[in-house]
Amino acid sequence: MGVGIVSYGVYIPRYRIKVDEIARVWGEVEDIARGLNVYEKAVPDLDEDTATIAVEAARNAISRANIDPHRIGAIYTGSESHPYAVKPTGTIVGEAIGCSHSHTVADMEFACKAGTAALQACMGLVRSGMIDLGLAIGADVSQGAPGDALEYTAAAGGAAYVVGAADLIAEIEGTYSFTTDTPDFWRREGIPYPEHGGRFTGEPAYFKHVMSAARGLMELLGKKPEDYDYAVFHQPNGKFPVRVAAKLGFTKEQIAPGLVVPHIGNTYSGSTLIGLAATLDQAEPGESIFVTSFGSGAGSDAFSIRVTERINDIRDRAPGVRDYIAIAEYIDYARYAKHKGKLRL
């Protein structure tokens, strides 16, 4: 049974803060944005969180393909910033989009790859015949401590994917995962901001896992980078995905459509899935997309995706990634700190 993407949707908050504005407050060098290849990032409104972002992305996915929500048999929401420690985000999504009560829900966590883990879980349930459609979501309102390196990129946004076996806009030809116990990034319960290993998050974490998963999938399928029209890699900044693509043999032209981090920052669980959505926004029938996520802790999920003729029927029925990027409203650090709850008494 072929399994793949029936529809997709994204949501990116309209508020933005320039990386240079953050650097100004902390007295950092002026070229930090160029060094990161991230120039601004998305900031949630005062009433936005992972749940509201997930709902908006899911609504866009439902409306794009005119899907009956009652057909959805599973909702898996991946995030590292769920609004409740004990209360599922997915139940909020299900109620908001009008699902029947005959569906299973679980919230997933695996740092920035929780969304692709949700996608794999939906694939398994659909392929087994247990459900008709699954809804996989990756969304975050990520946090970085004031003055920490993470603050320049930690952003907000999310993407939702409806997974099924019929009416596919893109078939998932295969998936492969690579996982180890690598403590490059962590946050204990009750601690407001995560800690990280600095440069340790690069070679032994991001690059090792992304490259291992990517090479594993290409070996499994007997494919090479030149067999793909596009490639999407997790985007913690604008440098890592460009570098890992080159190491694997992909070109800058292949990754350009999905490289959105310079404009919206690192949306964590939404990062890879928003990059995929940006690519689907312009991919043509018959073209192939290679996707690899990364989550600290650490692991990567790789996917080989082939776009079908149906993409042209539904693509323009909901806002695309570039539509959200275009409606930016800029704020200063004081308002940003208020929006992010950084002012604590």
From Swiss-Prot:
Does the record bear Acyltransferase in its keywords?
A: yes
Taking the record's annotation, the residue ranges forming a coiled coil are none
Q: Describe the family membership recorded for this protein in Swiss-Prot or TrEMBL.
A: Belongs to the thiolase-like superfamily. Archaeal HMG-CoA synthase family.
> Entry's SUPFAM superfamilies?
Thiolase-like (SSF53901)
> What pathway annotation does it carry?
Metabolic intermediate biosynthesis; (R)-mevalonate biosynthesis; (R)-mevalonate from acetyl-CoA: step 2/3
Q: Which InterPro entries match?
A: ACP_syn_III_C, HMG_CoA_Synthase, Thiolase-like
Q: State the active site.
A: 80 (proton donor/acceptor), 112 (acyl-thioester intermediate), 234 (proton donor/acceptor)
Q: Which GO terms describe its biological process?
A: farnesyl diphosphate biosynthetic process, mevalonate pathway; isopentenyl diphosphate biosynthetic process, mevalonate pathway
Keyword Transferase (UniProt): yes
Q: Describe its partners and assembly state.
A: Interacts with acetoacetyl-CoA thiolase that catalyzes the precedent step in the pathway and with a DUF35 protein. The acetoacetyl-CoA thiolase/HMG-CoA synthase complex channels the intermediate via a fused CoA-binding site, which allows for efficient coupling of the endergonic thiolase reaction with the exergonic HMGCS reaction.
The reactions it catalyses are: acetoacetyl-CoA + acetyl-CoA + H2O = (3S)-3-hydroxy-3-methylglutaryl-CoA + CoA + H(+)
Alphabetized CDD domains for the sequence? init_cond_enzymes
Protein name (Swiss-Prot/TrEMBL): Hydroxymethylglutaryl-CoA synthase
Which residues of the sequence carry a binding annotation for CoA?
199, 239
Q: Where does (3S)-3-hydroxy-3-methylglutaryl-CoA bind?
A: 29, 112, 153, 201, 234, 243, 266, 296
